[in-house]
Amino acid sequence: MAYEFASRLETFPKYRKFETTFAGRPFVVETGKMCGLSNGSAMIRYGETCVLCNVTMSDKPRDGVDFFPLSVEFEEKLYAAGRIPGSFMRREGRPGEHAILSSRVVDRPIRPLFPKDMRNDVCVTMTVMSLDPDCSAEISGMNGASLAIAMSDIPWGGPIAGVFVGLVDGEIVLNPTKEQREHSDLSLTLAASEEKIVMIEAGANEVDEETMMKAIRAGHEEIKKMLAFINGIVAEIGKPKKSFTPVELDHALLADVYAKHLDEVKAAMDTDDKNVRDAALLPIMDAIAAEHPDLTAADLDLISYKLQKKVVRTWLLEDGKRVDGRGINEIRPLAAEVGLLPRVHGSGMFTRGQTQVLTICTLGSTKDAQLMDDLSDTPYKRYIHHYNFPPYSVGEARAPRSPGRREIGHGNLAERALIPVLPDQAEFPYTIRCVSEVLSSNGSTSQASICGSTLALMDAGVPIKAPVAGISCGLITDGDPLHGGRWMTMLDIQGVEDFHGDMDFKVGGTRRGITAIQMDIKVDGLTYEIVEEALEKCRKGRLYILDEIIKPVIAEPRAELSKYAPKMFSMMIPVDKIKDVIGKGGKVIQEMCANFNCKIDIEEDGHVFISAVDQDDAKRAIATIKTIVEDPEIGAIYKGRVTRLMNFGAFVEIAPGKEGLVHISKLDDHRVEHVEDVVAVGDPIFVMVTDIDQQGRINLSRKDALAAIAKKRAEAGQQ
């Protein structure tokens, strides 16, 4: 039987390639070759960074949900950087912290532009396939995701585009290289549409508000160029948008509910106590359910949301009134406290209204730093901030879960806010971990975590350069602010204002300037005027917290560390001496760690870090290391250990690998007949270096060492 084998070259008739320049580097889009079954797909090549972006949508809406089910996944493949994963299976597992944070950065600008009444599942996936350290995979993924959605048949109000903005030597730099990022005072990820700012995520070295606005404006100008490029592609190959089945309530039913129950909802919500408000709303919703038995649980949730939203927004826009009776720029009652937990290294509790966070600071050695097995620029982290949000903090009766994306994002925000004020590792050679436990939540827990971390760090004696505080600003709009619509910002939003408002603009910083920003919105973007007003309100609120709340409680870091904290010391040794300190098979360093109850970390450049709970143990380890790396000096006294006995004297080890001879005549101040009459193998004895011959052999004297020690004691006694 004969077999025929056909061979043909696969062609891609829909393949298209588009090229432009983005912040001075080539930016290439390829479509029509890969992922033909996705609703929208694009391979982004920025420099040598390659990110494959796909978007898909379910054919039918998901039943029983009262939200838009959007999933955004940023997948980091270590092969992109030529690395094999460090896990046991040598395979990528669950998304790491960096991938989760990148997913959130892309999620936040694209989510508000989807129809709010759509319930079809939408999944956006960005896979990093090649990484050029000078060309951000995150920005490439954001722009690629925007393009993929815009050119797909999925309903969406985009596109948006993103850019990374740095500040190097006082100059604004767009999409800075890896080297520039290392020296930048600003790390700003910006997303925008043609006319509005859609997302801000920033870390900064105390940058002032004016400079921040300049960076935002500069980034927006570059974004407009990318948007023109994306719109050109969509105009050429974009698909017609699909229709979808919107989730709607019967207008007559909603009008009936408003007429009967809106005043009741207003009365229930007119309180500053979240528990009282929630309890007062329950019977109202029970009455609505009884009046309309055909409503589903999702329908009732939507009605409750619309009722509360109408009350909150009407009060603010029409009456300038807030739910809890505060003024528009008034901060909730504040309280701060330090030193709550006796055995921890540092603790601080910050309370703002019904929001309360307790932060605990723990100090560790350099070995405790977090190793980063991902595609981030940082190989390890010496400052770690973890944020925990237990169910009891919102009065829920359920078992706690492992940290989700929100917890990781809030922890990272507080982490970025504090990093600029931390001491250099050379000055303070500790790994620092802060854990923020949310005890009660009614809005702005991430900003309370920033304040709590400042308190805990100073209570622990960490010499931070300046205290940091955080506060948020909200927004209510009626119509498009860009075209005459009304809007109002308010300082220090609580939970109900966050839930029913249009913005959560979070800013952390010192008296000098901003250290972190995170902006979440539910509208299609913000004007420059709104951003500027939010920054200014947060600045004033931040200064009030620093001066009136934090400073009276703890004005500066404690002078001494907790007695339970490890004492850290650092020193430099010659690189060629590292092997001597470690010893064969690690014998020397292991013996020192065991003998002095300490941890010793040695870096490739000769930096040595010693940590011990007892300061004297650490100092003894330092002295031993010095004896190993330094040549013995004539006249120096050492505490050594007898290793061998001979007829003519005793050999004494004054440092690992360094032995000298104490002649029998130098053992004591009287005639010694037998060496074993004075010392035995293993005895610790004081010896003085008396001579080093041309061959490097060391001559020691116990007699001279004892005489010198006795003389010093006598002199000390006379004084």
What is the meaning of each model-derived region?
Residues 116-122, 157-159, 226-244, 275-276, ...:
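Flexible, glycine/charged-enriched surface loops at secondary-structure junctions
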Residues 38-122, 128-130, 135, 194, ...:
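Glycine-rich, flexible beta-strand/loop modules in the N-terminal catalytic cores of phosphate-handling
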Residues 153-268, 457-559:
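Mobile "lid/hinge" segments at catalytic clefts and subdomain interfaces of large enzymes
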Residues 564-568, 575-719:
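Single-stranded RNA-binding regions, centering on S1/OB-family and related RNA-binding modules
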Residues 2-58, 62, 242-377, 566-580, ...:
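Extended amphipathic alpha-helical scaffolds
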Residues 40-43, 135-153, 338-361, 442-462, ...:
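Conserved phosphate/anionic-ligand binding catalytic regions in large, soluble enzymes, centered on
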Residues 40-41, 174-177, 185-188, 370-373, ...:
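Short beta-alpha junctions and helix-cap segments that line functional grooves
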Residues 2-245:
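Long, basic N-terminal domains or extensions that often function
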